[in-house]
């Protein structure tokens, strides 16, 4: 609807106005940087000046200012027009948006107990503020008037999209509901936002609280040297000198499951990882999931939908539940069959070593690595020296330059969201500034898990001039020990290309209104997944896949083995992904929520009825499935496989020309796909 509501997606759902007057500078505090124009290079947030104490007064003032702007729109004596209503609404909330981008971004990558407490305090206010806008009858009347008389305003394509999206956001926000139902909707929106927040905070605590402490060096058998060095460093940081510590962060737990010879220790860390949020402690998420699914269903019913998935999917390319399930059901049998073949290979490896047991979940990665080596003579550790992080970064920049002519230059003297983050200026092929890209690579305790692309400022136009975006890509790679290189796996390298594809989507954005920058959830993964294709192209590998010590380009024999073995393991990967997609959908197609809903039993039935083998858990189990429970991919986790169909088609357009950097195809892809307002244009399927 406007830039403020859009910014909410970065951290919290925007909400309530407060009429409290706050001094710009609290007694004894430093000046609040949010109350002045940023004087930093390219106008990025002054991270080095922002303190936690600055957020609350700035957010309260931002909400107050936007409320006054809304009042002015409503009180305008002139007849509603596109400019005095739709554009005015789109441009409202400048301060609030400014603060939300900083607050949302930093609470995701550098959260603290103080920030989490502030989130719990502000969520109800922000939820109310959002509803105060969406449920303002006088404001909606003006929006509706413009919508119903749009022919008289002679709008261009972008203006029509803004009008349609604005009107739709009010309708989907409950503007047409009677007052009693609007009151109930407010309650549900606040409840949902708080439950989503609680879920995320609990998951982070569960991830951070566990440590596998190893005292005996023999228990490290099988682990690569750099993994051992990092575990020793983690132990030292926790005051456990002389020991080794492994955590539930992926760069720590995954190598342990993949290489550690000690089966009992693999079991211990595997169970800790897959039971996050399900330990019957203060961070338990089972009741949170139950209440959240129930509240979403109640909201959907209130809005006139039979279930929450129907409410969500109406806005997506899939449109309805049948289309989603048809896609998942089409892929599931072959994926599961392939996973069972891989399981047979794994059990064969166990028997080869004299084991008299069948594989369990904590055995899969360990014995799969052995099976792959037996089949293809390929060890993941053979490839890692060729995927040094700095080289991989140069690889993605090379691809972008070859495709679009854009360049990335590191900026040293600029505020950063974290001291370890890097900043780059992106310039178009004609030298004009496109935006700033942050890259935050390494895991740390206050950082959310996984990898994602976000932003600290959206692109728009102000006074006729383009306001460039500030984009950030966030990862959770293991930070190397002092003086050691950051060596990535092939999967981690693919992740860098993936998130960079999202970043290009943000950097290329060129719209005049905040409200037209959104695209359907099941489309948004297309730019990222297309970018992955270049990661393994021989022409690109020769540029970035160089040995970190010798500079030798990755040998063709190793590339051949990597390509040959590329599909091995897809049974596991696709099955665990589809299992999570089914879990997400099945929660949100429920037509009623039993009072005694047992989350563990529900999950077991959803996956058991489809024949999921016990050795493969869902990629995310219910109690730590942030994609769906925290709101970003609710009834939308299927989007990755949906977009995969599109990205294969899109990359094929390059391959058919015989040039993976074909400038004509690249130009069309940028124009029709990487510009959000034009997401529907794909190849010949326009």
PLM regions with names:
Residues 39-54, 104-119, 146-187, 247-287, ...:
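Short His/Asp/Glu-rich catalytic/ion-coordination signatures at enzyme active sites or charged loops
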Residues 680-686:
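Conserved small/polar residues in nucleotide/adenosyl-binding loops
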Residues 15-16:
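C-terminal motif of bacterial Sec signal peptides marking the signal peptidase cleavage site
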Residues 158, 162, 194, 201, ...:
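Active-site-proximal, well-structured secondary-structure segments within enzyme catalytic domains
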Residues 25-224, 654:
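N-terminal helix-rich structural modules
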Residues 480-495:
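Short pre-active-site segment immediately N-terminal to the catalytic Zn-binding motif
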């Amino acid at each position: 609807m406007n830039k403020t509501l859009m910014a909410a997606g970065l951290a919290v759902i925007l909400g309530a106005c407060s009429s409290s007057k706050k001094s710009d500078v609290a007694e004894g505090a430093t000046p609040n940087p949010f109350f002045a124009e940023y004087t930093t290079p390219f106008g990025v947030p002054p991270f080095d000046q922002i303190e936690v104490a600055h957020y609350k007064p700035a957010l309260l003032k931002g909400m107050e200012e936007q409320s006054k702007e809304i009042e002015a729109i409503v009180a305008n004596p002139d007849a509603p027009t596109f400019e005095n209503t739709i554009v005015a609404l789109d441009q409202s909330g400048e301060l609030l948006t400014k603060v939300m981008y900083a607050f949302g971004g930093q609470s995701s990558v550098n959260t603290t107990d103080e920030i989490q407490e502030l989130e719990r305090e502000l969520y109800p206010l922000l939820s109310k503020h959002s509803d105060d806008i969406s449920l303002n009858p006088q404001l909606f009347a003006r929006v509706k008037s413009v919508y119903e008389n749009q022919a008289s305003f002679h709008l261009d394509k972008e203006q029509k999209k803004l009008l349609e999206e604005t009107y739709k956001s009010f309708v989907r926000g409950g503007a047409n509901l009677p007052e009693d139902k609007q009151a109930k909707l407010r309650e549900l929106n606040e409840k949902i936002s708080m439950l989503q927040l609680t879920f995320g905070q609990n998951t982070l605590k569960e991830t951070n609280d566990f440590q596998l402490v190893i005292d005996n060096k023999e228990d490290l058998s099988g682990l690569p040297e750099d993994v051992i060095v990092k575990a020793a460093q983690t132990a030292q940081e926790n005051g456990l000198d002389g020991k080794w510590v492994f955590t539930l962060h992926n760069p720590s737990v995954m190598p342990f499951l993949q290489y550690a010879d000690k089966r009992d220790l693999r079991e211990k860390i595997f169970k800790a990882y897959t039971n996050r949020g399900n330990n019957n402690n203060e961070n338990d998420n089972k009741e949170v999931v139950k209440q959240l699914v129930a509240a979403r269903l109640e909201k959907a019913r209130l809005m006139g939908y039979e279930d929450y998935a129907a409410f969500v999917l109406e806005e997506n390319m899939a449109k309805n539940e049948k289309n989603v399930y048809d896609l998942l059901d089409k892929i599931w049998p072959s994926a599961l069959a392939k996973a069972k073949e891989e399981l047979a290979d794994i059990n064969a490896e166990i028997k080869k070593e004299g084991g008299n047991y069948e594989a369990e979940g904590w055995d899969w990665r360990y014995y799969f690595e052995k099976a792959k080596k037996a089949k293809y003579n390929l060890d993941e550790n053979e490839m890692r020296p060729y995927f040094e992080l700095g080289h991989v970064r140069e690889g993605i920049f090379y691809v972008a330059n070859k495709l679009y002519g854009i360049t990335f230059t590191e900026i040293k003297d600029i505020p950063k969201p974290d001291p370890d983050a890097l900043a780059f200026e992106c310039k178009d092929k004609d030298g004009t500034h496109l935006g700033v890209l942050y890259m935050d690579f390494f895991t740390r305790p206050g950082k959310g898990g996984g990898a994602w692309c976000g932003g600290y400022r959206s692109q728009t136009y102000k006074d006729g001039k383009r306001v460039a975006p500030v984009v950030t890509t966030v990862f959770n790679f293991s930070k190397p020990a002092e003086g050691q290189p950051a060596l990535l796996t092939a999967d981690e390298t693919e992740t860098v290309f993936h998130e960079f594809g999202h970043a290009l989507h943000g950097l290329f954005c060129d719209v005049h209104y905040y409200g037209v920058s959104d695209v359907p959830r099941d489309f948004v993964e297309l730019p990222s997944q297309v970018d992955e294709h270049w990661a393994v192209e021989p022409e690109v590998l020769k540029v970035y896949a160089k040995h970190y010590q010798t500079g030798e380009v990755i040998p063709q024999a190793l590339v051949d083995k990597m390509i040959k073995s590329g599909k091995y393991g897809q049974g596991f990967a696709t099955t665990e992904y589809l299992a999570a997609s089914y879990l997400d959908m099945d929660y949100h197609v429920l037509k009623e929520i039993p009072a005694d809903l047992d989350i563990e039993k529900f999950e077991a039935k959803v996956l058991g009825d489809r024949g999921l083998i016990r050795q493969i858990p869902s990629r995310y189990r219910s109690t730590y499935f942030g994609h769906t429970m925290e709101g970003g991919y609710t009834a939308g986790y299927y989007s990755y496989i949906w977009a995969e169909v599109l990205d294969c088609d899109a990359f094929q357009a390059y391959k058919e020309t015989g040039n993976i950097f074909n400038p004509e195809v690249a130009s069309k892809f940028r124009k029709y796909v990487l510009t959000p307002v034009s997401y529907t244009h794909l190849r010949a399927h326009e």
